[in-house]
Amino acid sequence: MLNTLIVGASGYAGAELVSYVNRHPHMTITALTVSAQSNDAGKLISDLHPQLKGIVDLPLQPMSDVRDFSADVDVVFLATAHEVSHDLAPQFLQAGCVVFDLSGAFRVNDRAFYEKYYGFTHQYPELLEQAVYGLAEWNADKLNTANLIAVPGCYPTAAQLSLKPLIDGGLLDLTQWPVINATSGVSGAGRKAAISNSFCEVSLQPYGVFTHRHQPEIAAHLGAEVIFTPHLGNFPRGILETITCRLKAGVTHAQVADVLQKAYGDKPLVRLYDKGVPALKNVVGLPFCDIGFAVQGEHLIVVATEDNLLKGAAAQAVQCANIRFGFAETQSLI
């Protein structure tokens, strides 16, 4: 059994991790922690997330010193803020733990990226070099031996799963940048209360236009520029992305279908649509990314859906852990 610590367990993604790890036959939860200053310290996880009542009733322990929790721990999931993960990951790695970081602290191997988009100076360039980007369907060979796994962002997961096989397969005319219009549920903003996330304020609106940190994350890992516009939707969870691309001259519907099938035909957590396009309701609460598309002449529209808290966060983290330790890829997920 892998002794597993979940840091930042009080949040939405943290609670999903608790659920997955609790039912994993090869993992056992050693502790659930929050920051020492958290108002949730000392509370039961099931008091904050009643869906866990009678299933996981562990307390949220305040953590001020990593050494109090790292002894005999094999796996650490960091469901923490970017700056917090930046500081904690090196300490857990030094203690011999395998770290799965759900924040953006190690996703892009470029220190300037963090100063520009995250507002802090990255102190661990050697870890940026070592970190494996956990886009599970594409990086399994590197995940096998990784000790620091940077779980991709929610928007980048759906965008890259949609575009990577098309770009790698040479089907797109990249002189016209792919345009990604993405809408996420309010849970993507986290559990902390804010006026902008309140029931009466949320409608449907774009944000981070030309400035969102997920645009350079997507572009860096695709090796191609994209235009990315996120939107906040008036629903709790889920992401839907509509991606508009130009195909190279002569590329057919059948070629697009073939490239996607070759990429994901044996990947259990990506579901391809032979006809039509996905709807959000079919992935909420599930660990899948659903992908469908339509072609008209040289124009391609790809639609991808996922649960932002699952395939966009907790489920992908556990999927990466399964790959890392040689378990069935979908263990505890489906």
Swiss-Prot record:
InterPro entries assigned to the protein according to its UniProt record, in alphabetical order: AGPR_AS (IPR023013), AGPR_type-1 (IPR000706), NAD(P)-bd_dom_sf (IPR036291), NAGSA_dehydrogenase (IPR050085), Semialdehyde_DH_NAD-bd (IPR000534)
Principal cellular location given in the protein's record: cytoplasm
Enzyme class: oxidoreductase
UniProt keyword annotations, A-Z: Amino-acid biosynthesis, Arginine biosynthesis, Cytoplasm, NADP, Oxidoreductase
SUPFAM superfamilies: Glyceraldehyde-3-phosphate dehydrogenase-like, C-terminal domain, NAD(P)-binding Rossmann-fold domains
GO cellular component: cytoplasm
Presence of the UniProt keyword Oxidoreductase in the record: yes
Lineage: superkingdom: Bacteria
Biological pathway: Amino-acid biosynthesis; L-arginine biosynthesis; N(2)-acetyl-L-ornithine from L-glutamate: step 3/4
Active-site residues per Swiss-Prot or TrEMBL entry: C154
UniProt-listed Enzyme Commission number(s): 1.2.1.38
Gene Ontology annotations of biological process type: L-arginine biosynthetic process
Catalytic activity: N-acetyl-L-glutamate 5-semialdehyde + phosphate + NADP(+) = N-acetyl-L-glutamyl 5-phosphate + NADPH + H(+)
One MF annotation (Gene Ontology) recorded for this entry: N-acetyl-gamma-glutamyl-phosphate reductase activity
Protein location: Cytoplasm
Family as reported in the entry's similarity comment: Belongs to the NAGSA dehydrogenase family. Type 1 subfamily.
Entry function: Catalyzes the NADPH-dependent reduction of N-acetyl-5-glutamyl phosphate to yield N-acetyl-L-glutamate 5-semialdehyde.
UniProt cross-references to HAMAP family, sorted A to Z: ArgC_type1
Protein name listed in UniProt: N-acetyl-gamma-glutamyl-phosphate reductase
Organism listed in the record: Salmonella paratyphi A (strain ATCC 9150 / SARB42)
Taxonomy of the source species: Bacteria, Pseudomonadati, Pseudomonadota, Gammaproteobacteria, Enterobacterales
